[in-house]
């Protein structure tokens, strides 16, 4: 017997609900001095000194991040004459909602509306995902572009891509790089071939990473690096390309952690839904449930990126943000297959994920409305 559709099953309703419940948090919290205020200061310094491609903080080079997010801060500073934290926070919240929409649209052929609701709300309320959706950082922007690139790859892989998708794929990859740096290319370049190897279709790499992808990526990066060199000279370009990439990967000068760091941080970074998503992700290994090609791809991306980032010297929990979506949605597809097979446990878990997520969002509303000081201490 089919269940009647509910209001919560509508993506537009869920998106509006997320926005309304997080609105007090967005309006009443204070900006953090270590990261958020620093980005505003970098934007002010760039506007004052006429820098556009090269970033500086208190006169010192700040090649840690590409300029895209700072450009957004600069744009609103120029338009409004002051910084508006609420508008800037939307450039984290809106990409988070777009990421949910992409994953729901992508997985709609394997997930019912009820399971899509559970998957997207549980992803939204993962600790680090929710936190990244309300702070002034570029991580969610990068996650959105990575998710778009993965969806575009899947359309190419399954023969559903339009001619434009062959150009959109490298464009999304570039925008991910331009948002956060080299971590933006790691999933499309390193994790996709892992999946293709397991599927014995490695030759498809020539279609995904063919001449169009490399041409557009080289052209856009070349333009960026040329203007960086023109404005900041060889020293800034060297800092951007080598010190901030190879230095962080091999012998990090910031956030250096042991190789097993993510083995324990992933549990609280995805909390509370790591307790469901991660164990369920291992079920196909034990033949408890069959994994479709889509699930295999999502899990291959999550597993390979986890291993790759564990081998990188510099580690922060938020670096795992791009794999939260694949993990949550893959686990929900597996749970729905179990429910279709008569599993009562899967039904219970779906309800826990749905109502637990709504409870977390309601708690965020109350805290933002009545206890903003406590929220500031958390961030």
Predicted feature residues:
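Membrane-integral, polyisoprenol-dependent glycosyltransferases
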Residues: 1-344, 371
């Amino acid at each position: 017997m089919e269940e009647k559709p509910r209001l919560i099953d509508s993506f537009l309703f869920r998106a509006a609900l997320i926005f309304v419940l997080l609105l007090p948090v967005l309006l009443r919290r204070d900006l953090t001095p270590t990261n958020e205020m620093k980005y505003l200061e970098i934007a002010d310094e760039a506007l004052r000194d006429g820098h556009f491609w090269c970033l500086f903080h208190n006169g010192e080079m700040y090649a840690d991040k590409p300029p895209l997010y700072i450009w957004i801060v600069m744009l609103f500073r120029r338009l409004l004459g002051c910084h508006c934290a609420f508008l800037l926070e939307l450039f984290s919240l809106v990409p988070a909602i777009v990421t949910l929409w992409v994953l729901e649209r992508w997985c709609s052929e394997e997930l019912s509306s009820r399971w899509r609701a559970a998957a997207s709300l549980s992803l939204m309320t993962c600790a680090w995902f929710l936190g990244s959706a309300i702070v002034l950082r570029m991580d969610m922007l990068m996650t959105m572009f990575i998710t778009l690139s993965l969806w575009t790859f899947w359309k190419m892989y399954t023969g559903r891509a339009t001619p434009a998708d062959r150009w959109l794929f490298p464009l999304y990859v570039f925008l991910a790089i331009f948002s956060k740096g080299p971590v933006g290319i790691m999933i499309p370049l390193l994790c996709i071939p892992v999946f293709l190897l397991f599927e014995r279709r490695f030759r498809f790499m020539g279609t995904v990473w063919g001449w169009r992808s490399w041409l557009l990526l080289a052209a856009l990066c070349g333009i960026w690096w040329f203007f960086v060199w023109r404005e900041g000279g060889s020293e800034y370009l060297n800092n951007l390309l080598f010190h901030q990439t190879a230095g962080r990967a091999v012998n990090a000068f910031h956030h250096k952690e042991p190789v097993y760091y993510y083995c324990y941080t992933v549990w609280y970074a995805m909390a509370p839904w790591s307790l469901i998503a991660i164990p369920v992700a291992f079920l196909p290994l034990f033949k408890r449930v069959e994994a479709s090609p889509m699930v295999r791809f999502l899990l291959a991306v999550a597993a390979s990126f986890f291993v790759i980032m564990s081998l990188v010297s510099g580690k922060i929990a938020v670096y795992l943000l791009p794999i939260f979506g694949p993990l949550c949605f893959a686990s929900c597809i597996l749970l729905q297959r179990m429910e279709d097979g008569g599993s009562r446990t899967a039904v219970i878990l779906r309800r826990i994920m749905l109502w637990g997520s709504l409870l977390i969002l309601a708690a965020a509303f109350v805290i933002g409305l009545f206890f903003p000081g406590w929220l500031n201490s958390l961030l």
